[in-house]
């Protein structure tokens, strides 16, 4: 039977979706995944574990158990990370598939709709990593808050100030693991990141979900001001 999981933020989301398709138990799957011996066997830390699961539709038997499911995912991970893709990792300045997955999860957190922006956003963040600039990605501190910021349009300094190893406003470089399970197309977009000079991005003042990219801080501040003014007007309209 087809087993599909996508738009998963955590291994808990993934286990829940998989348990609806197969006879396995989501709680048993989670405890198996968190078992230190299993993590060591597959070569992941708990934080990196989401990288092992590449969203797709997989054909499996209904009676696939937890152990068989995890082994199948480990096999699919190896198939995806072939020699050609592995060779791309160092070319873009990263070291492991887990790092690629972590960056891809940030790219996907920033942009889940317009796929043409993925390589640009990836290039922008790789520029920040190379220059030693904090990534300052909003989806990373949102991840720290769990579901508490769902539906919040205007994110504030108080939200960004959360102490959390995933908050890229606080830490330098990549967080310890992915903040969601990015589709394979996003992983490939990171491996084929666009060579751009951009350092900043800001949402466009419309409902397109697209971004204005900038090279300088001044340009970015202008974009940010335009967006904040637009957001204020939109919120006033809704109140009328």
Regions found by a protein language model. Give the residues of each.
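Membrane-embedded segments
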Residues: 1-2, 6-21
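Bacterial extracytoplasmic/cell-wall-associated proteins, especially those involved in peptidoglycan
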Residues: 16, 22-27, 38-240
């Amino acid at each position: 039977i087809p087993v599909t999981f996508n738009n998963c933020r955590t291994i808990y989301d993934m286990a829940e979706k998989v348990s609806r398709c197969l006879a396995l138990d989501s709680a048993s799957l989670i405890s198996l995944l968190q078992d230190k011996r299993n993590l060591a066997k597959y070569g992941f830390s708990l934080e990196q574990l989401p990288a092992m699961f590449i969203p797709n539709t997989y054909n499996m038997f209904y009676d696939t158990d937890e152990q068989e499911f995890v082994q199948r995912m480990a096999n699919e991970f190896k198939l995806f990370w072939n020699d050609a893709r592995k060779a791309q990792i160092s070319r873009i300045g990263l070291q492991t598939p887990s790092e690629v997955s972590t960056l891809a999860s940030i790219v996907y957190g920033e942009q889940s709709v317009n796929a043409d922006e993925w390589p640009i956003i990836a290039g922008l963040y790789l520029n920040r990593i190379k220059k030693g600039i904090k990534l300052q990605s909003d989806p990373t501190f949102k991840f720290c808050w769990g579901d508490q910021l769902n539906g919040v349009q205007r994110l504030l300094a108080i939200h960004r100030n959360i102490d959390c190893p995933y908050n890229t406003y606080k830490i330098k470089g990549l967080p310890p693991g992915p903040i969601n399970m990015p589709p394979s197309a996003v992983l490939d977009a990171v491996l084929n990141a666009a060579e751009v000079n951009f350092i900043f991005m800001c949402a466009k003042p419309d409902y397109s979900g697209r971004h204005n990219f900038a090279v300088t801080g001044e340009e970015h501040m202008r974009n940010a001001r335009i967006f904040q003014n637009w957001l204020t007007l939109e919120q006033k309209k809704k109140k009328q």
